């Protein structure tokens, strides 16, 4: 039977990226991220937000911090799941605003000199194709992950400081010069489901 469309929201899903919290102590980049999802019919409206700091000290010093957000729609292919699992594919628009500082040393006429470039108004935007799953663990507690293909990235800011890292996007460079115009990301979430009302799994049309 055909299913009656139901556009009234029935739940809100609120979560945090716990995978990042585990990786942070071992990484030069510190990320903290959360999300809110609202269902309507077979779709989810997603709003994601985060903060990132980075510090790289090798042949040069590069550091900065900033915030980012993503908004988008995803289709839930598991609307008839009795255990309230969610399996989605969707599209996001993402944007980041951040500051960055680059410090390096070079020698001129036998003397070592230090050069500093700073940009407090850097920004970037990109798009994402996503696929994800959330499964129920206990009561309203859920566990899940989202895989992202990030593409069509564009950066804005001081031309003298090409971003090495972009909050929410990741590494902007494959090496010292070559840019990463596309990349893949993975988030591992714990979330809590707030039910707004009961929703029938399927309602046949007469």
Predicted segments with their positions:
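Extracellular/periplasm-exposed beta-strand and loop segments of Gram-negative cell-envelope proteins
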Residues: 23, 49-65, 98-108, 112-124, ...
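Transmembrane beta-strands of outer-membrane beta-barrel pores
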Residues: 18-22, 40-42, 51-55, 75-77, ...
